[in-house]
Design a protein with these regions (language model features):
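Phosphodiester-processing cores and adjacent nucleic acid-binding clamps
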Residues: 1-156
């Protein structure tokens, strides 16, 4: 039985620029997608667009070779409900750690920990969101968000 090729465009993929989560250079992803009948591909690396120049150069090369393929530029960003609440929780966990160190537990079997307030998992709780540029203005907006995210508290 021969399988019919369906039109498919992957809108979320990681290259080697997503440390610990992706592999292969953008051009390898593009060649693979094109070789499997796709006419476009979005690479959405974690928190950066470091592969964009590779995408752009390879797309030009593919076009020169007569291949109909469109790179889609994007990023996988992280979303938290409230940066202020996150900062408060981080500060509270830090204070709880300091207080726990100050309490002398050598004469008892007491464990000093408030499991509800000292849950580090709450600090790493975040949602992923894929941002794709529809046009030049969208690309500029993504650049701006990424740039701002690398300043201050590493959030935007």
């Amino acid at each position: 039985m021969e399988l019919k090729k369906e039109q498919f465009v992957n809108l979320h993929g990681h290259s080697c620029f997503s440390l610990f989560d992706g592999f292969g250079f953008p051009q390898e992803h593009m060649d693979f997608a094109h070789g499997n009948g796709s006419k476009a591909l979005a690479l959405t690396d974690h928190g950066s667009m470091n592969g964009l120049s590779y995408q752009l150069l390879h797309a030009k090369q593919m076009k020169a070779e007569g291949k109909d393929f469109k790179p889609i530029f994007g990023v996988e960003a992280y979303y938290i409900d409230s940066l202020d609440e996150w900062k408060e929780l981080k500060e509270q966990i830090s204070l709880d750690k300091k207080r726990a160190k100050e309490i002398d537990t050598s004469d008892s079997a007491m464990v000093v920990e408030d499991e509800q307030r000292n849950d580090k998992r709450a600090l790493s709780r975040k949602r992923h969101i894929v941002l794709l540029a529809q046009n030049q203005k969208g690309l500029e907006n993504i650049y701006e968000m990424i740039s701002k995210s690398y300043g201050g508290d590493y959030f935007y």
